[in-house]
């Protein structure tokens, strides 16, 4: 059959920009999927999706005008039911054949197949392959029905009676197979043709008559002034943004924001980047405020200098390309000025009150109906932060003479004071005008206002950083004060929400508990904090009084699950991760070293045998119940058990010393020499001896072995 390329376009009013790319991919993807299912494409068919503010389209190569005829075998009924004793068709069989468009003359051609215990009749026929127009109609209906439409509109067709539900009113449908219009294809009250429309203002031809499926993109570009491909349009905008920054000079660069670039790509059909500017006096306002208002409200790209500082210039992606762009530039500069003036006003007004003076206002801000106000939350965070700071300082002071002295006490008092001040003031920017207008700036504005109030840098940084990390890959708090307050804030959220039963379910996580858990993990691991997880959770629960249930064990499971998932994403195998997490390590900061030790151990020749033996030991001890690891040498009878005991006495102290010093790799490698005595023990010694004293002694020997082997990880989890 003659393959031709297929083009389908749905021409609509301006689509929601944040949903455009998803809509375009879904529309084209379902069309291809449905045509493939009907046998209308080849094995080499390729899909190109198009999506612009006013169109969704798909170009599919090697599409057949009709699907090939297909042999169909339909199960009818058992022979005993369909044929009588003389081999004549029964009324039941004749009725079934009539329903299939056949008659008694077809009975001799029926196929008999053994199906289980009975012989069954099958009717074989050739099904006519679907015509492309019919197949496309089905595919188009399915593609429209499956579009991930964020919000549906209802509108009437020109007849004034028929209502249509779609994301935006549709005004045109193109369906071309090669150069031929697929007659009869319809969608949303429209009949397919070969005409579409280009740019609202700059098309040189309107309507644009598409000559063939393959000329679609080029004709829209040359005649319609439209770049139909989302990806090509995005790349063109990125190119123009950089070119405009280069023209400005001085090493400036446009801010990098993939989401903003996607949104702007969905707003224009023919991008034209222009350089605009605002008064330099606005640069006295924190740049985060100016950047956010330009990006969120105006979809502008601020220009940053080589040091990442905001300049007074910005880039606008216009949808028109006039010969004289001065009016467009002036219009955008005029529009942004009031936005920046508002930000300056908020900043100036907010600084008239100190953060301390705003603390009482938090008592009027509801946090959660079961957990009270933001004021109550602040007191909980202070309680938790003090406990964490004390634990941290105590851990750091161990073995550190400088901290375990009078100077150390002064340092501890300063740390506790800074932590308490930061925890007290961390949420006060929630009641400022700036954060009320731009919630995304919470924490950031608190840091600026803390500097304005003359607070120590550690406190200002902690207030700014206490929400970090906000997302995957985000920076962590800079100093210990910020780390402590950030940990306290996240633990308050986790313990509180778990305590009232607000747990993540499936895709729903309204309180971002997964993100909070990963934040706790990242800080503990990447900052190498000498803090125990159970101690952290235990310090947080009392802060809630009787408002919550103590769900520390459940929350710990949740955190270990998040940790395991994160480690697998970092490239560790499921077995390696499982072996370490099975021990529920308290110091998460040590987990990376444990994993590296396990990975090195698995490369040893002795590893498989020791892992298998460890699994066997685990099962024996599990059945034995409580086992005393004490070994009575006088009860050791067999040479193999004496050799194992001697090996443990010789190598375990060395392995333990290496473990205690943090050299987990060396510890496991030292224990690898136990392979031979362990193998010999299981070959030659009956563990469950009839004599009780002998049995308990051998179980104790295995317990001693088990304790020595599984300090770094549960090696039984490595057994294949």
UniProtKB/Swiss-Prot annotation:
Name this polypeptide is given: Glycine--tRNA ligase beta subunit
Entry's Gene Ontology BP terms: arginyl-tRNA aminoacylation; glycyl-tRNA aminoacylation
Keywords: Aminoacyl-tRNA synthetase, ATP-binding, Cytoplasm, Ligase, Nucleotide-binding, Protein biosynthesis
SUBUNIT field: Tetramer of two alpha and two beta subunits.
Source species of the chain: Acidovorax sp. (strain JS42)
Record-stated family: Belongs to the class-II aminoacyl-tRNA synthetase family.
Enzyme Commission code(s) on record: 6.1.1.14
Gene that encodes it: glyS
Main subcellular location: cytoplasm
UniProt-recorded Gene Ontology molecular function terms: arginine-tRNA ligase activity; ATP binding; glycine-tRNA ligase activity
Catalytic reactions of this protein: tRNA(Gly) + glycine + ATP = glycyl-tRNA(Gly) + AMP + diphosphate
SUPFAM superfamilies tied to this protein: HD-domain/PDEase-like
Top-level lineage group: Bacteria
């Amino acid at each position: 059959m003659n393959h031709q390329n297929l083009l389908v376009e749905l021409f609509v009013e301006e689509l929601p920009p944040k949903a455009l790319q998803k809509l375009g991919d879904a529309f084209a993807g379902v069309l291809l999927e449905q045509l493939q299912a009907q046998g209308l494409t080849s094995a080499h068919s390729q899909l190109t999706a198009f999506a612009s503010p006013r169109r969704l389209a798909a170009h599919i190569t090697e599409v057949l005008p009709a699907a090939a005829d297909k042999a169909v075998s339909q199960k009818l009924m058992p022979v005993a039911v369909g044929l009588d004793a003389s081999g004549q068709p029964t009324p039941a069989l004749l009725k079934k054949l009539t329903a299939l468009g056949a008659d008694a003359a077809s009975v001799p051609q029926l196929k008999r197949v053994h199906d289980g215990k009975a012989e069954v009749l099958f009717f074989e026929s050739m099904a006519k392959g679907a015509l492309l127009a019919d197949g496309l109609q089905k595919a188009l209906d399915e593609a429209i029905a499956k579009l991930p439409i964020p919000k549906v509109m209802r509108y009437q067709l020109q007849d004034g009676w028929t209502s249509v539900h779609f994301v935006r009113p549709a005004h045109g449908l193109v369906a071309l197979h090669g150069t031929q219009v697929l007659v009869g294809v319809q969608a949303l009250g429209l009949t397919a043709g070969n005409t579409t429309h280009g740019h609202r203002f700059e098309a040189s031809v309107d309507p644009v008559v598409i000559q063939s499926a393959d000329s679609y993109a080029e004709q829209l570009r040359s005649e319609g002034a439209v770049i139909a491909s989302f990806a090509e349009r995005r790349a063109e905008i990125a190119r123009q943004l950089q070119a405009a920054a280069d023209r400005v000079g001085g090493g400036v660069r446009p801010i990098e924001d993939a989401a903003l670039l996607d949104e702007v790509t969905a707003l224009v059909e023919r991008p034209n980047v222009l350089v605009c500017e605002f008064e330099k006096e606005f640069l006295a306002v924190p740049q985060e405020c100016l950047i956010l208002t330009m990006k969120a409200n105006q979809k502008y790209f601020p220009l940053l200098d080589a040091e990442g500082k905001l300049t007074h210039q910005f880039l606008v992606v216009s949808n028109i390309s006039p010969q004289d762009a001065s009016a467009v530039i002036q219009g955008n500069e005029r529009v942004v000025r009031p936005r920046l003036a508002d930000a300056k006003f908020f900043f100036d007004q907010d600084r008239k009150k100190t953060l301390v003076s705003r603390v009482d206002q938090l008592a009027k801000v509801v946090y959660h109906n079961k957990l009270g106000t933001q004021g109550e939350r602040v007191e909980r965070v202070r309680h938790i932060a003090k406990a964490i700071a004390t634990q941290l300082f105590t851990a750091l002071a161990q073995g550190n003479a400088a901290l375990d002295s009078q100077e150390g006490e002064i340092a501890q008092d300063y740390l506790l004071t800074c932590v308490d001040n930061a925890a007290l003031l961390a949420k006060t920017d929630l009641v400022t005008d700036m954060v009320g207008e731009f919630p995304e700036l919470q924490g950031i504005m608190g840091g600026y206002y803390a500097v304005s109030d003359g607070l120590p840098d550690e406190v200002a940084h902690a207030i700014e950083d206490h929400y970090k990390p906000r997302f995957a890959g985000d920076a962590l708090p800079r100093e210990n004060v910020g780390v402590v307050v950030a940990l306290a804030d996240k633990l308050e959220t986790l313990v509180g929400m778990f305590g009232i039963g607000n747990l993540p379910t499936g895709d729903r996580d309204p309180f971002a508990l997964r993100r909070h858990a990963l934040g706790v993990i990242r800080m503990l691991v990447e900052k190498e904090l000498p803090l125990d997880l159970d101690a952290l959770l235990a310090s947080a629960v009392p802060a809630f009084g009787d408002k919550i249930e103590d769900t520390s064990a459940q929350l710990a499971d949740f955190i270990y699950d998040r940790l395991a998932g994160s480690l697998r994403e970092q490239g560790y195998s499921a077995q390696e991760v499982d072996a370490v997490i099975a021990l529920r390590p308290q110091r998460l900061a040590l987990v990376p070293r444990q994993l590296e030790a396990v990975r090195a151990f698995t490369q040893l020749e002795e590893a498989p045998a020791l892992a298998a033996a460890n699994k066997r030991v685990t099962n024996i001890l599990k059945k034995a119940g409580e086992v005393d690891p004490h070994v009575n040498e006088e009860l050791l009878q067999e040479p193999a058990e004496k050799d194992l005991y001697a090996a443990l006495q010789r190598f375990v102290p060395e392995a333990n010393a290496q473990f205690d010093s943090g050299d987990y790799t060396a510890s496991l490698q030292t224990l690898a020499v136990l392979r031979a005595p362990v193998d010999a023990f299981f070959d030659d010694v009956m563990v469950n001896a009839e004599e009780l004293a002998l049995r308990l002694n051998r179980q104790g020997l295995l317990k001693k072995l088990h304790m020595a082997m599984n300090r770094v990880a549960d090696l039984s989890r490595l057994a294949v």
